[in-house]
Every structure is written in C-alpha cells, then in structure tokens.
Amino acid sequence: MSDDSSDVKPGPKGPEQPAVEQSPENVPAPTGEVHQVGARHGMFGVRGTGDTSGYGGLNQAIVLPGDAQRPYGGWFDEVADGLAAATREAGLEIAAPRVVIHRGEITFHLRREDLLPVAQVLRDDERLRFEFCAGVSGVHYPDETGRELHAVYHLLSMTHNRRIRLEVAVPDADPHIPSIVPVYPTNDWHERETYDMFGIIFDGHPALTRILMPDDWPGHPQRKDYPLGGVPVEYKGGTVPPPDQRRSYN
C-alpha cells in the first residue's frame, strides 16, 4: 500500500454556501439615536458608606436603543408588514408602533389603548400566529418623565418559531394598562406579580391582588424608589434556649 498522498483524489465539489447567514442577528437593522432615560451614580443605590473600592464613584448614562429603520432584516419585516395588514383588514385604528431592534430581538412599542386589539391580532391572524405569551415584565425608569413605568410582553409563535416583544409605557401618576388575560389567560399570575412589584394596574383583570407580598404591604418592592433596606418587621414570641440546650451539629 502506498503512502503517497497524491493517490488521494478530491471528491465532488459541494454547493456554494453564503459567507454569512442572512438572519436578523447577522444583518442588524440600522437604528436611530439612543434615548437617555437617566443616569446611574455609584452601585446598588448605596450612599454614604465610605466606599474605598472605587465603584462608588461610577457614573453611567442609562440609555435605550433608538428606532429601527427599514429594512429590518430577516423575518422582522414580514411580521411588521403582517401586523400592519392584519390591523388594517380588521378595521382597527391602531397607531403605527415604534419598532426597536436590539441584540437581534424586535420590540413593538404600543399605546396602551392599542395593546388588547393588537394582542388579539397577533394571536389569531394566520400570518402571525403568536399563540403563547410567556408573561409580562415590569420596568421602572423614575427619570423618564411621563413614561416611568413600562410593561414588556414576551410572545412566541410556535407555528413560525418566532419571538417578539410588545412594550407599553405609562406615567407613574396614571399606571393603568388593559389586561390581556382575555386573550392570553396564562398571563393572569404574571400581571398580578407585575402589579405587586411595580404598581401597574391592569384594568379588566379578573382578580388583581398581590401575589407575593401580603395584601396590606406598603409600596412595590421592585421600583427604583423603594427603600433598599426594606421595611422593618418585629417578630414577637421568639425564644433563644441556653447554650447547653441548643441543637448540636457535630
């Protein structure tokens, strides 16, 4: 048997492959200028602690990505066009949503009065078919005057294997957003949690009560203006046994 590598003949040439996959992640849409909504000073909200690590002197702008420009790339344009066509065919007077594409993910920013009909269209229209809502997340931007509270909905199309987000912003003085439980019943407890933690009131929810904190708990613990130290609670009736009666762990 010869060890001469010249005896090895190359196989047939395969089909040409594109240099880069043409997906939304690899072909990002051009975006506008970022939008600053606040500034962060130091770490974790702690003040006046005599910090010597240097982190207490950090100053960082809090910015949100700007609006995306057409073409968005990949299937993003198909979803945006399908949503516009479906709402128009349904006779809905829906304001054109702001579209933000960041880190390969698309978000539609809606007015609160448009949320429920848009959710209905996204679920039912055959071009869209976002059958599943994974929940709603709350975000608090205390320096974004008139838009302090944001509700972010995460939708999945199992038919088309696509994920999008819807986002609605409301003022702290009027924190009302329509509930989408009539469209996505599994959002029930998620809306209760967002109400409990952020104080967003979901109008039309079947039973909007606290879900983590006691019913009489003051405030909403995940807001930026909530005290870092929490609320002092006094426990009564506790006893500490003498050392010779304590449990041994040896």
Swiss-Prot record:
**Which catalysed reactions does the entry list for this protein?**
a quinone + NADH + 5 H(+)(in) = a quinol + NAD(+) + 4 H(+)(out)
Gene Ontology cellular-component terms listed: plasma membrane
Query: The organism sits in which domain of life?
Result: Bacteria
Q: What is its EC number?
A: 7.1.1.-
What molecular function terms (GO) are annotated for this protein? NADH dehydrogenase (ubiquinone) activity; NADH:ubiquinone reductase (non-electrogenic) activity; quinone binding
Record-annotated disulphide pairs: none
Renumbered to this chain, region (Disordered) spans 1-33, 228-250
A UniProt-annotated Pfam family: Complex1_30kDa
- Name the job this protein performs: NDH-1 shuttles electrons from NADH, via FMN and iron-sulfur (Fe-S) centers, to quinones in the respiratory chain. The immediate electron acceptor for the enzyme in this species is believed to be a menaquinone. Couples the redox reaction to proton translocation (for every two electrons transferred, four hydrogen ions are translocated across the cytoplasmic membrane), and thus conserves the redox energy in a proton gradient.
- Name of the protein: NADH-quinone oxidoreductase subunit C
Organism listed in the record: Nocardioides sp. (strain ATCC BAA-499 / JS614)
Task: Write the gene name.
Answer: nuoC
